[in-house]
């Protein structure tokens, strides 16, 4: 299955996913690199994680406007190819370090070097990364999802800060 994004607009909607929490994935829907449109939280069992996550993405209200998924998965808990197949969206697996034994493509910017893997053409991925990387060590979709994942934000009820459930 091949995906194509014909034009990459300034306000492309990207779903950034972070898997730093145990049995939970937090996502941020970001428009370009400047606007946060929404937050997605999915509790995942250990088995069938990518398939369950993809079905939750398909059921979300943000799905019709999403153009790609940016995955920050330092523990390699999800299979990007399976997520891409079930969600029917291209996946950009982004990391600050190159994975051992893999030759991921490198993207260089003023903020540093980012290694990525995707089935999209390198020119399209580079354009998406240049539009969404505005500050910090990761592009905004993955960075916001990572901040949410590392915070003590109680996303269950959509309110305030509090202890993790």
Where are these regions (language model features)?
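Two-metal-ion RNase H-like nuclease active-site motif
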Residues: 1-21
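Charge-biased, low-complexity intrinsically disordered regions
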Residues: 1-2, 42, 49-50, 54-57, ...
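Short coil/turn connectors at secondary-structure junctions
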Residues: 9-12, 64-66, 87-89
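Structural motif
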Residues: 18-20, 71-74, 96
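A glycine-rich, hydrophobic loop/mini-helix early in the fold
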Residues: 23-68, 74-75
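Long, charge-dense
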Residues: 46-47, 62, 78-119
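Charge-patterned, long linear interaction tracts outside catalytic cores
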Residues: 124-165
